[in-house]
Amino acid sequence: MTAYWISVYREIVDEAKVAAYGALARPALEAAGGRFLARELPEQTYEAGESTRVVIIEFESVDAARRAYESEAYAAALAALDGGLIRDLRIVPGVG
């Protein structure tokens, strides 16, 4: 069953660190089978929605998404991020 990596950026602390992270994270996650579906600010928010960057990545399974997060390549991206960002990251199984 497909799974979705959903990341909501709460606060960008250091733009340079976020850029360094992005340069490493995208290729690491794509190499692990991730397919980027969205990466941007919302066009519209409702209810308690905040206008902060959202990233949605599709994986073939929850296990594939977990393996991507735990990979050496993604660990290097996290090391580059080094506190430059406060975010909410979830891995959610797809429906059906």
Predicted regions and their residues:
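Short S/T/G/P-rich N-terminal loop/turn motif that feeds into the first structured element of a domain
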Residues: 1-53, 60-70, 93-96
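C-terminal structural segments of small proteins and small subunits
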Residues: 65-90
